């Protein structure tokens, strides 16, 4: 079975994020490569989940990156990343342990990114968070 790329256009239709299917872990979660129009090289050899969320002005894109993926157990950790396509930078918003949780962007409100962390386990807790991402330390230039 050939999986077609998932194209996620920006709200202004001037940019697009493209997820290309790479595989599936034992739990059924799928993982992808990510391509962005204007950033061809810096995302190579990185693995992403299926969630991409654009800001309403099409400047920011938030994604879930998988770190140290194991095809059976899944990723060692999930990163919630944000890309600033105007300044061509990226920043880690949050990180959670992959075997016990998952992290997903939910929405942009003003200068904040709302996101959810789902903690697996016996009681399965879900927590919502807010990050004023533009003031985070650790922004790095995309190559």
What are the functions of these language-model segments?
Residues 36-41:
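Short strand-turn-strand beta-turns centered on an Asx-Gly dipeptide
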Residues 52-57, 63-77, 87, 99-104, ...:
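Acidic, low-complexity, intrinsically disordered interaction modules
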Residues 25-33, 69-82, 121-135:
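Structural motif
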Residues 33, 51, 60-62, 79-84, ...:
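Ordered hydrophobic segments in well-structured contexts
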Residues 11-26, 58-71, 108-120:
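Short beta-strand elements that form the blades of beta-propeller/WD-repeat-like
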Residues 42-47, 94-97:
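Surface loop/turn motifs at the tips and blade-to-blade linkers of beta-strand repeat domains
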Residues 1-11, 83-143:
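Acidic, small-residue rich beta-repeat scaffolds with periodic aromatic anchors
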